[in-house]
Amino acid sequence: VIRRSRLERAEQLGVATVRLAAGQTQRQVAAELGVARSTLQDWRKPEAVGAPPAVLAAWMETPEGVRWLHQLVLAAHFSITLQGAAGIRVVCQFLELSGLSAFVGASYGPQQALNAALEETLVAVAEEQRAALARGMLHRDLTVCEDETFHPQICLVALEPVSGFLLLEQYAADRQAATWTQALKAALVGLDVAVIQGTSDEAGALHRHVEVDLGAHHSPDLFHGQHEVSKATSLSLARQVRQAAATVVAAQQVWAVERAAQQAYEEQSPRPCGRPPAFAARLQAAVSEVVQAEVAHTQAQARQSEARELVRELGILYHPYDLERGQAQPVEQVAQRFNGVWTQLGRIAQAANLPTRARERLAKAQRLTTQLLATITFFFATLQWQIEALALPPDLERALVEQLIPALYLERVAARSTRAEPRHRLRALSHQLLEPLRHGDHPLQALPSAERARLEQVAGECADRFQRSSSGVEGRNGQLALHHQGRHRLSDRKLAALTAVHNYHIRRADGTTAAERFFGRAHETLFGQVLQRMPLPPRPARRRPRPPKPPCLMPLAA
């Protein structure tokens, strides 16, 4: 028995409709199509499900209608289950509410099978695209951001921070250094890359994995240092502000009571016999208490504000280039600024009499200084050998090191700024550094356009080398948490499908996918490739009326 697909059936039904309209009999048309006459009659029988418009129902039986329905159903699965973090039952409900259940089997079983096929196809297409893009890939030195998340199984996640390309996303039995190294090396097979830097938290296994197993530089995540400072100061200082405010209120109430007592005494007529109470001394003491409480409150607020500003200062000073002038910051200058911050925080801790646990947190954050300074040293060292490898004349090399790379770095910092004022100021400073390079008499303008583009690309890679945050992988962990919350379990196939969607489908504002940014080449659309390989959606089953359920207390037959 030959089983025809839904599209083949629609195509043959279209041919049969034309021939029947031309006057041929059903028997003749069935013989020409190679089907039984009863099969042709069944094809032409109207569906007994739903009540869609006749025009729509007829169009759905055409090849164009079948293809459109195929694309629509797959788009629903793709968007709802792989990007919207919802389940298959939401897709079933969408098909019911939209009326598409008249043309597609909307029950859970058929849709679950279709969703499983979609995930398998996604993974296969992503692997093929990765292999195709890797064949023409130029060698790259990578920075890798790494972190673990828990579902509660351990999930290892690693991505390249500039492109956002997920290099690794898989479950593991543990999170030891050897496990990390084995998983990452397997993920990089076939890619012409070398990991020269890893950015992560301060987990010992990640340190060993990056520095010992990979022989790369470990760049600490600045946020973790800032977070330690915030935990050490925010709660205690906020408590002191609240207590000082309560003391001010209590002192003001005492002063008000004393003043009211004085007024009540003076309003008495006649006044009581004897010496009057010492209202002046009591009021003076109450006023003194109010002043002291207000001073203490002001000092507590000042310490709290200063601590917050110092946390921000850690983020402002930790850059290879000065954000005020756009010039390179020597490591000694950055170290001096760090020491100033730690000194001020120590003074606040002493003035506020912070508890021992808070002082230990401050010491823990301060210990990161050595690694932070080492990262700036690493940045300038790699920048130097990468620029020297270009073998440029001294004037061009100076232009790249002192103007182009700092300008591109400031441009990237401005793009990540959340406030308008620093964003506009940094962009203006970047433009100021680039302006001389754009003049026609500058040596850079004498180079061919292809050479200028190559130098700009190298300068951009140098600017991107400084990575002080692993927030990209933290954000990915948050997305995985949403998917896990909706399902309570992510299979290896589901996780691989989610990785494929992230790398080859999701596009930034510039219209590029993570894979295009990572490999430097465009690729065919993921959904288009999947659409060509996926089976057609199942037809709805003919509804059979169910017999009514008899009452539980129906009497038995005699």
Where are these regions (language model features)?
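Active-site proximal helix-loop segment of RNase H-like, two-metal nucleases, encompassing DDE(D)
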Residues: 239-253, 462, 472-490, 505
